[in-house]
Amino acid sequence: RVLLIAYHYPPMHGSSGLQRTYRFAQYLREFGWQPAVLSIDPRAYQATSAGASPLDGVEVCRAFGMDAARQLSCFGHYPGFLARPDRWVSWWLGGVISGLKMISSFRPDVLWSTYPIATAHLIGHTLAQRSGLPWVADFRDPMAHDGYPEDAVTWQSFLRVEEKVFSVAAATTFTTGGALDFYRQRYQATHAKFHQIEN
């Protein structure tokens, strides 16, 4: 059994990131794994689609979380701490609480989280620390790298998330060889299990 932690999941509409988690949940079952999904409350999505349906037979838990830019701003402005490492950091607490309940009831053998969104890895990190379960951290894109994020404080917050990942995760996966090589060079002294799984 595997608990998938992902921001992008139906009924969200309009993001290519949906497909990776959706297909993981679909194909893991073909390899004998039973997946469940921990995601965010759909109110945090900018757009949803009634036609975007979760997989039948896959348990989905929606934890509280909001988009700081849309739901926590006043006249278009909001404090920076509400958006670090990203605008959905309010999902962390709800995700941890809901995730611990799912671990107790669903009893997964492994945790899996995917970036983007960085908060998904924060949830995965906390759940791995609290439960002792092995954790696989998936990177659809690199996090802190040259020129991204542009804001220096946000860049540092991304780097801190990375450091949490590579100090605790049992394995990491990447969509491209370039991203894998980038992180192997950065963290090879403390982390050995790098894998590439293309989209």
Task: Locate the predicted segments by residue.
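An aromatic- and histidine-rich active-site surface loop
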Residues: 45, 85-97, 108-131, 137-139
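N-terminal subdomain of nucleotide-sugar transferases
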Residues: 1-64, 171, 199
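A short, histidine- and acid-enriched strand-loop-helix "catalytic/donor-clamping" loop
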Residues: 10-12, 100-101, 119, 133-153, ...
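Short acidic, glycine/proline-rich loop/turn micro-motifs
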Residues: 73-76, 106, 146-151
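A conserved catalytic-core segment of Leloir-type glycosyltransferases
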Residues: 37-103
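Donor nucleotide-sugar binding/catalytic pocket of nucleotide-sugar-dependent glycosyltransferases
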Residues: 39, 61, 134, 144, ...
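Histidine-centered beta-alpha loop that forms part of the nucleotide-sugar donor binding/catalytic region
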Residues: 7, 115-116, 139-142, 198-199
